Amino acid sequence: MIPTFTALLCLGLSLGPRTHMQAGPLPKPTLWAEPGSVISWGNSVTIWCQGTLEAREYRLDKEESPAPWDRQNPLEPKNKARFSIPSMTEDYAGRYRCYYRSPVGWSQPSDPLELVMTGAYSKPTLSALPSPLVTSGKSVTLLCQSRSPMDTFLLIKERAAHPLLHLRSEHGAQQHQAEFPMSPVTSVHGGTYRCFSSHGFSHYLLSHPSDPLELIVSGSLEDPRPSPTRSVSTAAGPEDQPLMPTGSVPHSGLRRHWEVLIGVLVVSILLLSLLLFLLLQHWRQGKHRTLAQRQADFQRPPGAAEPEPKDGGLQRRSSPAADVQGENFCAAVKNTQPEDGVEMDTRQSPHDEDPQAVTYAKVKHSRPRREMASPPSPLSGEFLDTKDRQAEEDRQMDTEAAASEAPQDVTYAQLHSFTLRQKATEPPPSQEGASPAEPSVYATLAIH
């Protein structure tokens, strides 16, 4: 018995503080309308009330109407309720508040929501004095006029945080009107405006909206902080609201824009510098190559032939078309003993004394056999001194060869020389009685 009593006492002590804390005032809900609080006659509107997850019921009250005006169960996840108005009429215009009920009681009332209906009266006219195009820092006045005896006017700026501005009308003229001065004008004042007219005893019923007026602000981007607009010639009601927020003009977007422009400019300059550097390097390399080529051409004597190969033996070069066009070979004749199977018939131009004489050599060859030695031939005629290299660098030989279709190939070689040294050699003493042999020409033949 005693342990049971002790357990119940501890449970009561532990639940006591919690119950005491929850019994306090609940936070007030949030109330708003979609698509907005200013609704044209005949259009639908939805009122939302949002509380906490512990809410069990939501209630909507309308001023000057029996309470509660409507009750709704919460929607999942049970933190808000919806109140629908299918068609807006004069009966729905007014001021609303909402509550929600939790297990511990009802919450505090929400902030008021003013539901305004337009289209109850004829539309007024809206104009700008002196002009809808105003320079930043100057003053401008928006004038709303009505032909009907209206005493309340409202000015609305589209997409503004606080769209409504209530002002009383000015009496003493045939046309009732209200002035909305703006001084000094800044960039935040620019935009599209409309005005409404109504009676003071029911300012939730408005006229049709006026034609839109576009206010254009030109000049410097940095403007002073706008001051709240008030009518000088009218008395403001307690429901007056500022036309625009009175905070400082935000410049974060402009600063970000300048930062982007500066970054793009820096990147462009870097890319241009890199391109100029590459072009300069390419121009310098081309200039060095041109100078090196000119120096090489200057060191080589004009008309000098390519240096002849030092190897004077028989050189054979094979190609894939060798079986069809015959063998291509280079033969250097340096002694008086031609290779086996080669018969050379030389014919010299009649102008032997011409330094640029042309000599044709008919070469009849067969497969050379390197293991057999040919008999020595007599040495006579003119020959080229091969020991003097510097004197023979002026010699150039162009050869043209044509493959013959006969079983034995016949090749003609054209010898074009710039400087020829002719030397006549006397026959050996053992051949004085023999008939003189034809002169021989020793040259390097390159047959392609």
UniProtKB/Swiss-Prot annotation:
Misc: Activated by APOE on acute myeloid leukemia (AML) cells which leads to suppression of T cell proliferation and promotion of AML cell migration and infiltration. LILRB4 signaling on AML cells is mediated by PTPN11/SHP-2.
GO biological process: adaptive immune response; cytokine-mediated signaling pathway; Fc receptor mediated inhibitory signaling pathway; immune response-regulating signaling pathway; interleukin-10-mediated signaling pathway; negative regulation of activated T cell proliferation; negative regulation of canonical NF-kappaB signal transduction; negative regulation of chemokine production
Cytoplasmic side: 281-448
Topology Extracellular: residue spans: 22-259
Site (Required for APOE-mediated activation of LILRB4): P35, W106, Y121
Cellular-component GO terms for this entry: cell surface; cytoplasmic side of plasma membrane; extracellular exosome; plasma membrane
Gene3D superfamilies in alphabetical order: Immunoglobulins (2.60.40.10)
PANTHER family hit by this protein: LEUKOCYTE IMMUNOGLOBULIN-LIKE RECEPTOR SUBFAMILY B MEMBER 4, MHC CLASS I NK CELL RECEPTOR
Ranges of Basic and acidic residues composition bias in the record: 344-354, 384-398
Induction summary: Induced on monocyte-derived macrophages by S.typhimurium infection. Induced on monocytes and dendritic cells upon contact with CD8(+)CD28(-) alloantigen-specific T suppressor (Ts) cells.
Tissues expressing the protein: Detected on monocytes, macrophages, dendritic cells, natural killer cells and B-cells (at protein level). Expressed in the lung.
Entry annotated with the keyword Cytoplasm: no
Motif (ITIM motif 1): 358-363
Consequence of changing P184A: No significant change in APOE-mediated activation of LILRB4
Domain notes: Contains 3 copies of a cytoplasmic motif that is referred to as the immunoreceptor tyrosine-based inhibitor motif (ITIM). This motif is involved in modulation of cellular responses. The phosphorylated ITIM motif can bind the SH2 domain of several SH2-containing phosphatases.
Effect of E170A: No significant change in APOE-mediated activation of LILRB4
Ranges annotated as spanning the membrane: 260-280
This protein's UniProt keywords: Adaptive immunity, Cell membrane, Disulfide bond, Immunity, Immunoglobulin domain, Membrane, Phosphoprotein, Receptor, Repeat, Signal, Transmembrane, Transmembrane helix
Organism of derivation: Homo sapiens
Domain Ig-like C2-type: 27-118, 124-218
Record's protein name: Leukocyte immunoglobulin-like receptor subfamily B member 4
